[in-house]
Amino acid sequence: LSKSSIKKYQAMKDKKIDVMVIFTTDGQLAISDVVVLEDDKKMYPSYRAGTVVRSEILSKYPELKAVLEKLNNILDDKTMADLNYQVESEGKKPEDVAREYLQEKGLLEVKQW
């Protein structure tokens, strides 16, 4: 998050503002008590992660499809907000947060040398 994004969450907490535009993957949502309104008009796009692979790569490495399919639907907005919070507010390295999460999900095994 940018400093201005963190400031807007602080302004909400301090009751200086009543409404703000957010991303549902904002790290600050993990620790905030703001109420996120439903986007019933679908004005804002989804920021959910997905995998995209060229067909020629899958033809060359067919085993890749099964590996990548394991990543489907493991990240929802709340999880992304939690992971983003670890990077944005706790100062963890993105690669460390990703590694820990994938290990928790049983998708990555780290072997010691």
Predicted regions and their residues:
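Ligand-binding "clamshell"
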Residues: 12-17, 28-41
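Short secondary-structure boundary segments
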Residues: 23-25, 55
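Short Pro/Gly-enriched coil loops immediately N-terminal to beta-strands
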Residues: 39-49
